[in-house]
Amino acid sequence: MAYQTPYFVIDENQLTKDFQMLKSSLETSWGNYRIGYSFKTNSLPWLVTFLKAGGVMAEVVSDDEYSLAGALGFSDSEIVYNGPVKKRPSFERVLLAGGILNMDGRRELDWMEELAAAHPTQTFRVGIRVNFDLEKMCPGQTTMGEA
C-alpha cells in the first residue's frame, strides 16, 4: 500500500497513556502547571483537538498557527504566543484577551510598554526570553564548545 508523505501514524491508546502519565507526573511534582502543545511540532488538526480535550494550551509561533488555534477552538486565553516574528495586531490581541506571550527582543518590549500605557489597569501575562552564553558560564559542560 502506498502512502503520501508526510504520513503520521498515531496510536491513540498509547498517546492517551503517555499524556496521562505526563499529567500525573506534573501533578505530583509541580501541582500548579499548564501544558502547552507546540503547533510547530505537528499541527495536524486531529492531534491538536485530541490534546485540547486533555486541557493543553496552544503554543504558537506565527499568525498562521495563531489562526489555526482559533479555528480549532482555542480561546485567546488558551494560547501561548512565542517566536521572534510576531505581528503587532496578534501580539496585542493575545495579551488583551489574557493569553500568555513570551517576548523576544527590544521591539516587543517597546510594544509592551505602549500597550501597558494604553491599558493601565490591565494585567498582562508575559514571559521574557533570555539568551546567554551557557558555555562561557559552564565551561565544558555543554555541547556548544564541541566541534
Feature-to-residue mapping (PLM):
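ATP-grasp fold ATP-binding core
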Residues: 125-131
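A charged N-terminal "starter" segment
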Residues: 1-117, 121-125
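Active-site loop/helix belt of alpha/beta enzymes
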Residues: 115, 132-147
